[in-house]
Curated annotation (Swiss-Prot):
Residues reported in the UniProt entry to bind ATP: 725
Source organism of this protein record: Mycobacterium sp. (strain JLS)
Motif extent ('KMSKS' region): 722-726
Name of the coding gene: leuS
Main subcellular localisation: cytoplasm
Subcellular location: Cytoplasm
Name the record gives this protein: Leucine--tRNA ligase
C-alpha cells in the first residue's frame, strides 16, 4: 500500500479548540488524502473473468455483487444535496458487501445526450460536446468529494463514440430481427427470409416468394422487423422544430422545455415494436424484486385487457371496434372515431342529412368542413388533455354504421376523447353504462339504452354488474355469460372475434435534433432504407454550421421537421457498396431519443473497454447471469441492486427491459431481465420562498424575523417542496463538505430517514452528524496530544460485549436491507455507550471503526491506520456477531400517528430513544400511513409507546 499523506490538525480553530479535534479542516485533509490513496491503489477496481479487466490468472471470486445507480444527466448547474442521496446509499451498500468479502462492481457513468446541451449550443454557438464534457468534469469533481467507491475505469458517457458505437450496434440487432409469435421470441430476420424461400412460411395472398420482385420482398420483410417506419401520430412542436415524446409534453399540451404549443400530426417516423413483448413484459414482473407501486405502474402502462373485436358495417367498409364489454353491444347507440382515424375522410358525407340535429354539426355547413374545423380545434391538445373530465365535444360525419347485434343504424361521430393510439381508434358508445359516453349522449341528444339492470341511468351511467335486459337472446344472463354468448354469436356471424388488447403503443424512436446518436441507416435513390453493416460503425456525429433544427412559428401546425443534420451535406450524401456495387446513398438525419443509451448501459459496466463486442458473454454471465441457488429457480438474472427515482418507473425501465429481452432472445446475454432488484429513493425536500407575485426567491438570502420571512426588505412566504433549481432552494454539497466534511454529509443524509421516504433538509441539523463523528474520533485519538488512546489488552465487561455484538448484528442487518438510518442510530447508541462508560479497549473500538466505515469511509480509514493497520479496511473484515451475546429480552412498542395506533414494533428491551425513533419511522405500515410526510415531532415514552405527530 502506498503511504497515505498524514492529515494535519486544524490550526485555524480558536485558541480554546483542542489542537487535534476532528474539524471541517481536518476532515477535508483526511478526505483528500484517502481519496488520493484509493485512486492510486485502485481500491475499488474489480476484476472480470475475461478481457482487459481480468486478473493474470483469470480467477474471480464466485461471490459477486453488482450495484448500480440511475446515472445522472450532467447539467450545467452541478449537484445539489438532493442528488447524492441515492449515490451515497448505494455506496454504503456496496462498501458493506465489499467488506464481507464480495467482489462488488459499482461504477457511475453519465447520460449526456439530450436537449439541454443542444439548446445551450444553439444559444452560444458552443459545440454540445464541449459543454457536456465540462459539466462531466464538474460532476466528477463533486461526486469525488463524497468518497464514492466507484471503479472509475468503468465510467463512461453515452456521448462517447466508444459507447454509442454499441448503441448503434444494438439498434441494428433489433432492426435485423422479427418476433416469432409461435416461438414467443425474437429471431434474426435472415431466418424469416429463409422460411419464405424454403416455403416453410407462405404469404397471406398465396403468391410464391420467387415471384415477388426485390422491392416486394423488401416490403414484406420490413413489415416483420422489430424496427420499422410508419406514418404515426406524433407530438410536433414547431417552436422547437422537433417531434417530442409523450413524456416531453405537459398536461396542457405544451413542450416541457420552452413552453411552446405542441400539435398532434401524422409523420413518417422510426418505431420500435415493443408491443410484441407486451405479454412477456407483464409476466416477468412477477419474478422481479421491485416495489409493488412500480410493478402496478408498468402493468397499467401496458394495459392488457380482454374483450372482443366487433365489425360495424358502413358504406366505406367495416369499422373495427375493440370493446372489453361485448355484453353491452345491444346498448351501443352511436360510434365515435378518433379524429385521426384513417376512415374519417371516406366516411364524411358531402352534405348533412335533412334532419340533422344542429348540435351535431360543429357549426359547419358540411360534414367535411366540420371534420376540418374540429381537427384544427384539437390539434394542440395532448392525449392527457383530451381525456380530462370536461364538456364533451365532437362532430357528426353525416354517416351511419350497422350495429351487428340488432341491425340498427347508429350515427358516427368524431370526438377528442377517443385516441387513435389505443385499440382501433374507434369505440362503440354505450351511454347507459359508460360515463363518458353518457355525458356525450346528453350533450348531443343521443339515445341512452339500459342493457344491464341494477342502476338508474337517468342520473348517470351504471357501470356495475347485473342481469342483461333489452338484449334479445342475452336477457337474463349475467355479465360473464353474456360476454361469452355474444362473442360466440359474433364469430358465427363473421362480425367479430375474441381479442386481447393493450394500451402499450410501439416506441417512437426518432428525434429531429442534433445532439443524439445518429442512425446506422441510409436510403437509396428510391427512398428505401438500408441498414449499414457492422463494419461501418460507428456512424459519428458530424459538425454542422449550427445546431438548431429549422424553427417555425410556434403556432404553425402545418410545418414539417427539418433536422439539423441535413445541414451536414458532405456527411448526408455518401458512396457505399452494400452488395450491389458502389452507389450514392443518403443518410438518415434523425437521431435517437435520449432513452437509447440508458436502455442498455448496465451491460457496458460489465465490460467497458471491450472493442470487439458489446460485452464478453463470460463477463455478462458472471455479473448478471441467473443465480438460482441464491435467488430461486425463477431468477431472471440482472443487476443485483438498482437505485433511482420513481419518476423513471415506467418509460426508462420498460424500454430497457424491452431491449434486454431482444438481446436475450438473440443470444447476446444470459439474463432475461436487466434489473433483478429495484429500490426507489425518496426526495430531499427543503423550504422555498415566494414573493407577492408568486415568484421564487433565493432561499439562502431569506431571513427570519419575528416568525416572518423577508427577502430584500419585502415579506416572502414559506412553502415546502422538492429541493432544486426551480424552487431556488438548492444547497450545494460543496458547501456542506467545506463546512463539515464529506463524511458528515454522508452520515447526515443517511440518518434523515428511510431511503424510500422523502425527507426535509435542514442545514442547521448537519452539525449533529458532525458531532457524532467527533465522538467516534475521540474514542481513538486524544484531542490534546493526537496520541492513540486505545488500550490493547483491556477486557470487555458483559454489558459492553452485549452492546457490541447486538450492534454488529443489527448494523449488519440494516446495511444489507438499506436501512442506513437505523444503522446510524445503532452506531450512535453504541458510541454513546463507549463514551459514557469510558471504554478504551481495542476489542470494543476497532469493531466500531469497521462498522462506521460504510457510512464515513474517510474517517474510518484514518482511524484504522492510526490504530496500527497498514492495509485499507475497504475490503474488510466486517465484524461478525457472537450469537451468545445476542440473547436478550425484547419489548413490543405500539406506534401511534397523531395519537392513534397504526403499527407495532419489536425492539431490544434496552433500546434507546434514537433506535426506537428510527425503528418506528422505518416500519412499513407507518411509512404507508405517512405517505411521504415527515413527522413534526417524535415522542418516545420508554417502555410504553412511540407517537409521531404529523
Amino acid at each position: 500500500m502506498t503511504e497515505t499523506p498524514t492529515a494535519q490538525p486544524d490550526r485555524a480553530a480558536d485558541a480554546d479548540t483542542p489542537q487535534h479535534r476532528y474539524t471541517a479542516e481536518l476532515a477535508g485533509q483526511i478526505e483528500g488524502a484517502w481519496q488520493q490513496t484509493w485512486a492510486v491503489e485502485g481500491t475499488f477496481n474489480v476484476p472480470n473473468p475475461v478481457g482487459e479487466l481480468a486478473p493474470p490468472d483469470g480467477t474471480v471470486p464466485a461471490d459477486k455483487m453488482f450495484v448500480q445507480d440511475m446515472f445522472p444527466y450532467p447539467s450545467g448547474e452541478g449537484l445539489h444535496v438532493g442528488h447524492p442521496l441515492g449515490y451515497i446509499a448505494t455506496d454504503v451498500y456496496a462498501r458493506y458487501y465489499r467488506m464481507t468479502g464480495r467482489n462488488v462492481l459499482h461504477a457511475l457513468g453519465f447520460d449526456a445526450f439530450g436537449l439541454p446541451a443542444e439548446q445551450y449550443a444553439v444559444q452560444t454557438g458552443t459545440h454540445p460536446r464541449t459543454r457536456t464534457e465540462a459539466n462531466i468534469v464538474n460532476f466528477r469533481r463533486q461526486l469525488g468529494r463524497l468518497g464514492l467507491g466507484h471503479d472509475t475505469r468503468r465510467s463512461f458517457s453515452t456521448t462517447d463514440v466508444d459507447f454509442y458505437t454499441w448503441t448503434q450496434w444494438i439498434f441494428l440487432q433489433i432492426y435485423n430481427a422479427w418476433f416469432d409469435r409461435d416461438a414467443n421470441r425474437a429471431r434474426p430476420i435472415a431466418e424469416l427470409i429463409g422460411e419464405f424461400e424454403s416455403g416453410v412460411r407462405t404469404l397471406d395472398d398465396g403468391r410464391p416468394w420467387s415471384e415477388l420482385s426485390a422491392g416486394e420482398r423488401a416490403d414484406v420483410v420490413d413489415s416483420y422487423r422489430l424496427v420499422y417506419r410508419a406514418d404515426s401520430m406524433v407530438n410536433w412542436c414547431p417552436g422547437l422544430g422537433t417531434v417530442l415524446a409523450n413524456e416531453e409534453v405537459t398536461a396542457d399540451g405544451r413542450s416541457d422545455r420552452g413552453n411552446f404549443p405542441v400539435f398532434r400530426k401524422r409523420l413518417r417516423q422510426w418505431m420500435m415494436r415493443i408491443t410484441a413483448y407486451s405479454d412477456r413484459l407483464l409476466e416477468d414482473l412477477e419474478v422481479l424484486d421491485w416495489p409493488d407501486k412500480v410493478k402496478t405502474m408498468q402493468r397499467n402502462w401496458i394495459g392488457r385487457s380482454t374483450g372482443a373485436s366487433v365489425q360495424f358495417g358502413t358504406d366505406a367498409g367495416d369499422i373495427e371496434v375493440f370493446t372489453t364489454r361485448p355484453d353491452t353491444l345491444f346498448g351501443a347507440t352511436y360510434l365515435v372515431l378518433a379524429p385521426e382515424h384513417p376512415l374519417v375522410e371516406q366516411l364524411a358525407a358531402e352534405q348533412w342529412p335533412d334532419d340533422v340535429d344542429g348540435r351535431w354539426t360543429f357549426g359547419a355547413t358540411t360534414p367535411r368542413e366540420a371534420v376540418a374545423a374540429y381537427r384544427a380545434s384539437i390539434a394542440a391538445k395532448s392525449d392527457l388533455e383530451r381525456q380530462e373530465n370536461k364538456t364533451k365535444t365532437g362532430a357528426f360525419l353525416g354517416a351511419y354504421a350497422t350495429n351487428p347485434a340488432n341491425g340498427q343504424q347508429v350515427p358516427i361521430f368524431i370526438a377528442d376523447y377517443v385516441l387513435i393510439g389505443y385499440g382501433t381508434g374507434a369505440i362503440m358508445a354505450v351511454p347507459g353504462h359508460d360515463q363518458r359516453d353518457w355525458e356525450f349522449a346528453h350533450e348531443f341528444g343521443l339515445p341512452v339504452v339500459e342493457v344491464i339492470s341494477g342502476g338508474d341511468i337517468s342520473e348517470a351511467a351504471y357501470a356495475g354488474d347485473g342481469l342483461l335486459v333489452n338484449s334479445d337472446y342475452l336477457d337474463g344472463l349475467d355479465v360473464a355469460a353474456a360476454k361469452a354468448a355474444i362473442t360466440d354469436r359474433l364469430v358465427a356471424d363473421g362480425r367479430g372475434r375474441a381479442r386481447v388488447e393493450y394500451k402499450l403503443r410501439d416506441w417512437l424512436f426518432a428525434r429531429q435534433r442534433y445532439w443524439g446518436e445518429p442512425f446506422p441507416i441510409v436510403y437509396d435513390s428510391d427512398g428505401r432504407p438500408h441498414p449499414l453493416p457492422e463494419s461501418a460503425l460507428p456512424v459519428e456525429l458530424p459538425d454542422v454550421p449550427d445546431y438548431s433544427p429549422v424553427l417555425f412559428d410556434p403556432d404553425d401546425a402545418d410545418s414539417e421537421p427539418n433536422p439539423p443534420l441535413n445541414k451536414a451535406t458532405d456527411w448526408v450524401h455518401v458512396e457505399l457498396d452494400l452488395g450491389d456495387g458502389l452507389q450514392t446513398y443518403t443518410r438518415d438525419t434523425n437521431v435517437m431519443p435520449q432513452w437509447a443509451g440508458s436502455s442498455w448501459y448496465e451491460l457496458r459496466y460489465t465490460d467497458p473497454l471491450n472493442k470487439e463486442a458489446l460485452c464478453a458473454k463470460e463477463n455478462e454471465a458472471y455479473w448478471m447471469g441467473p443465480r438460482p441457488a441464491e435467488h430461486g429457480p425463477d431468477d431472471p438474472g440482472g443487476v443485483d441492486l438498482y437505485v433511482g427515482g420513481v419518476e423513471h418507473a415506467v418509460l426508462h425501465l420498460l424500454y430497457s427491459r424491452f431491449w434486454h429481452k431482444v438481446l436475450y432472445d438473440l443470444g447476446h446475454v444470459s439474463s432475461r431481465e436487466p434489473y433483478r432488484r429495484l429500490v426507489n429513493q425518496g426526495y430531499i425536500q427543503a423550504f422555498a420562498y415566494t414573493d407577492s407575485r408568486g415568484s421564487y426567491v433565493p432561499a439562502a438570502e431569506v431571513v427570519e424575523r419575528d416568525g416572518k420571512f423577508w427577502f430584500e426588505g419585502a415579506e416572502v412566504f414559506q412553502e415546502f417542496g422538492k429541493i432544486g433549481k426551480s424552487l431556488k432552494n438548492s444547497v450545494s454539497p460543496d458547501e456542506i463538505c467545506d463546512n463539515y466534511g464529506a463524511d458528515t454529509l454522508r452520515v447526515y443524509e443517511m440518518s434523515m430517514g428511510p431511503l424510500e421516504a422523502s425527507r426535509p433538509w435542514a442545514t442547521k441539523d448537519v452539525v449533529g452528524a458532525h458531532r457524532f463523528l467527533q465522538r467516534v474520533w475521540r474514542l481513538v485519538v486524544d484531542e490534546q496530544s493526537g496520541a492513540v488512546r486505545v488500550a490493547n489488552h483491556e477486557a470487555l465487561d458483559t454489558d459492553t460485549l452485549r452492546a457490541l455484538h447486538r450492534t454488529v448484528a443489527g448494523v449488519s442487518e440494516d446495511y444489507a436491507a438499506l436501512r442506513n438510518n437505523t444503522a446510524a442510530a445503532k452506531l450512535i447508541e453504541y458510541t454513546n455507550h463507549l463514551t459514557k462508560e469510558g471504554v478504551t479497549a481495542r476489542a470494543a473500538i476497532e469493531p466500531l471503526v469497521l462498522m462506521v466505515a460504510p457510512l464515513a469511509p474517510h474517517l474510518a480509514e484514518e482511524l484504522w491506520r492510526r490504530l496500527g493497520h497498514d492495509t485499507s479496511l475497504a475490503h474488510g473484515p466486517f465484524p461478525v456477531a457472537d450469537p451468545q451475546y445476542l440473547v436478550t429480552d425484547t419489548v413490543e412498542y405500539p406506534v401511534q400517528v397523531n395519537g392513534k395506533v397504526r403499527s407495532r414494533i419489536t425492539v431490544d428491551a434496552d433500546a434507546g430513544k434514537d433506535t426506537l425513533e428510527a425503528a418506528a419511522l422505518a416500519d412499513e405500515k407507518v411509512q404507508a400511513f405517512l405517505n411521504g410526510a415527515t413527522p413534526k415531532k417524535v415522542i418516545v415514552v420508554p417502555g410504553r409507546l412511540v407517537n409521531l405527530v404529523v
